[in-house]
Every structure is written in structure tokens, then in C-alpha cells.
Amino acid sequence: MTEKKIDRQADKAKSEQLVHQLVQRIDTHPGDADAYYELATVLVDLKSYAQAEELLMKALGLFDAQPATVEKLRYGLGNVYYAAQDYPKAIQQFDQLNDQWKGAGYLMLAQSYMANGDHKRALAFALTALGSQPKDEATLQVMAENLLALGNMAQAAQYYDQVLALDSKNGHAQFDRGLVAMVQGEPYQDYFTRAKELDPIYFDKGQKRLADIERFVQAQRSPKKPQ
């Protein structure tokens, strides 16, 4: 048996033990909304999506007179659908939330689509998230990364600048901002120097992208030979 398989089995056993404890907590304190939320989270970890959905639907009925609790439970239900990759239902839940929870929900959707290479859809969800949390660093960075992937360098630069204004020690953003500057024919070396200091792992991983962009920039600047 491999180490990874042993670790997975240990994690599963731990989660199942946690389920047992949280069920007991709910039985003892049926008015503890956090216990429902935490139990649903553990069920999602176990990929028991139908059980998590049923639990949170029940909790929404029990705590319907507590608006703040309903927000959290609805966000949890959106997470269940998100984890199960039922995005239409996740969106339906996130749409009903206040700005704080809605922004977090839509940011997750944006990150998921980005991971799958669907940058246009990711950008749409990131933009919606940004409407709820315009100064959120993670949301601004997702906006910038998708704009970069789509080749919209001018707008990507604006969003990276906002990210770096909030956190100048973000090595990931420093490196990507350098790539944008390189394509735009602007000074870029300072960004790469900072990125190497702040996030050497990301800097090393980005070397292929850097080489590709350098070749692209050189090709754009080289005079074309007459046919």
C-alpha cells in the first residue's frame, strides 16, 4: 500500500470521526447553526454532496428567522453545489447573498473556470465578484491574470497595479506585471528582480513563459523581410 493511499485512508477516517462528533453536537444542541455548517463542510470533503445538500436545506428551514445565519448557510449550500460542479445551482445560491458572501462565492467560480482554462467565463465571474468587493486583493489578481491570459495587456496592467498597491510584496503579481510591461515595451526588470526576491519558486516556474514572451517581443520588433 502506498503512502498516499494510507494518508487518504487516514484523512477519511478522521473526517468520518468528525462527522460522528458533529452529529452528536447537533443532537445535543439543535440550535447550533455552526455545527450544521461544519458538518456540511466535512461531508463535502467526503464527497457526500447529497447528504450535505439535505443537511443545509434542513438548516435553512430551522434558522429562517436569523438573517445572518441564513446568509452563511446559503453560502455553504452554494459551496456544496460548487464542489459537486453543479455551477448553475451554485450561482443560484450565491445570487441571493449579500455583498460579503456573494463576492467570495463568485471568486471561487472565477478561480474554477480559470483553472480549466476558460478565461472569458472566469473573467465574467471575477468582474461580478469585484462589484461586491472592489478592493479585494485576490479578486483583483484573478481579474489581472485572466486579462493577461486573454492578451488584454493594458487592462491587465491596471489590475496588477491595484494588486501591488495593496501588497507590494506579492511576488506572483510582481512577476506577471513584469511580463505585461515586457509585452508593452515598458521597463520591466525591476518587477522581475522583486519577484525573484519575494517568490523565487514562482519566478523559477515562470521562466518558460518569460522565454516565450521574449521571443514574441523580439519577433514583433524585428523588421519583416520583403516577400
Model-derived segments and their meaning:
Residues 30, 64, 68, 100-102, ...:
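Short coil turns that delineate tetratricopeptide repeat
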